[in-house]
């Protein structure tokens, strides 16, 4: 008979992988998306992005926004897109190049922040999670957008990813530092305020966190206040700094936007763009909530629901509208894979131990 003392038990830790080997295995997952980013510097740029950059350039060059150059997009959209235009006046390169450069810089900044924030989520305190989620996020930032790179939905997800992961930590009782919370809220707020539909995301998230944490914790959390501050300041600017937009352009935009396309929100629900995303969100959301049993998974589901509501509210069914919701569904799948992989490994170790006892 083989002695059980010579064999590993369920409590025995598997042999650890040297850090150098781990980094080597993760290298392709990090390097390939970075190489993919290089392709975005070659023309053509996304046509919607090009149109917004053109309006921003005319505004920066002296034309009066909403008077001499009229566009239905909100003022903050042109403020954000004025940054690459202004950069091109200081440094070599045209606005489209610097737009791509600024988005790429934002991707790396968001990726760095997300890697740090993942370590604060108690239920994500696992080597596989810390190894898997950042490369998946980098894939969602770089490869998934493809021809929609730079669309506001893409910028939204990149800017809100730290807010999303911070909310996963907040949902599990973690309090972030005041400085980090304000920075996360302000960055997310700028992206969320570029379209009114986007505000469905923080509305859903903060409502869930309010129910889970109560009024006291919610009212002392700087993140929703920072987001709200940006949204309110933007709204006020529509009737002060950009008065022509609030008084004349916005009523015309509301009237003109609805007839664009012939789908409507009911058609969007069953379209070949949103319907698969909703199905994936429901399936992976249920699996994640049932198998992981964590507040972080539920927060991620709520983020996806808010993003889906945003896409439905736009009532167009355009592919890039679902990018944030689709990204949430993919992250839910990654989160579930990690949890089930861990459980499977533990079950396998226990089974082997029992076999040889």
Task: Please state what every model-predicted region is.
Residues 220-261, 270-280:
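Membrane-lumen/periplasm interface segments of specific transmembrane helices
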Residues 123-126, 155, 161-183, 280-296, ...:
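Membrane-interface transmembrane helices that cradle and orient dolichyl/undecaprenyl
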Residues 54-57, 70-93, 101:
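Short hydrophobic/aromatic helix or loop-helix immediately within or flanking a transmembrane segment
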Residues 3-5, 18, 201-228, 290, ...:
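Perimembrane helix-loop-helix junctions
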Residues 111-115, 119, 274-307:
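Hydrophobic, aromatic-rich transmembrane alpha-helices
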Residues 178-196, 202-207, 304-313:
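Membrane-interface alpha helices of multi-pass inner-membrane proteins
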